[in-house]
Regions:
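Sigma70-family region 2
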Residues: 6, 22-40
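Internal acidic/polar
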Residues: 64-91
Length: 161
């Protein structure tokens, strides 16, 4: 379910992605062929791949509702001081922060950082330009930094009081 949460707008969308993914898995289970000696890891990878591509399909289906304009912006890596509070944040909080991003930003961020897709692969899968992928990733990182900064300020206020 965590994969679905990363790509969904809300819990209902995550459940829809999960259900669609399991339908695909049940329909295609006969095609599964273990790629490695360790069948469990191979099967988990196969399931994960189906869920990710189901989430991409969900994004494409709803793309017209949340397209972001194309901009060619260079992607910059966040500096250490910009993400310094990350170690104070739980996994569930990170997922909630990611869910607060727009669908376009959230999808590109998840595909790039979590799934390891290249910008070229993201552009091909989502039907956007490489520049848009880079721009959306940069904007997603910037928004997450703001969210994290605000969260840290709230935590500091609570600790003082």
């Amino acid at each position: 379910m965590a994969i679905c949460d990363c790509y969904a707008n809300n819990e209902d969308d995550a459940i829809e992605i999960l259900n669609d993914g399991f339908l695909k898995i049940f329909k295609e289970i006969h095609r599964y062929k273990p790629a490695y000696a360790n069948e469990i890891n191979s099967f988990k990878g196969w399931l994960r791949k189906i869920m990710v591509y189901t989430a991409i399909d969900h994004f494409r289906k709803n793309k017209k509702h949340h397209l972001v304009g194309e901009l060619d912006v260079a992607v910059t890596q966040p500096s250490a001081h910009e993400i310094s509070g990350l170690d104070k944040v739980s996994y569930d909080e990170i997922i909630r922060f990611i869910q607060r991003l727009s669908p376009a930003y959230r999808t590109v961020l998840s595909l790039f950082i979590i799934e390891g897709f290249s910008h070229e692969e993201i552009a091909e899968q989502l039907g956007i330009s490489v520049g848009t992928s880079k721009s959306n990733l940069a904007k997603a990182r910037k928004q997450l930094q703001k969210i994290l900064h605000n969260q840290n300020q709230i935590s500091e206020i609570k600790n003082v009081g």
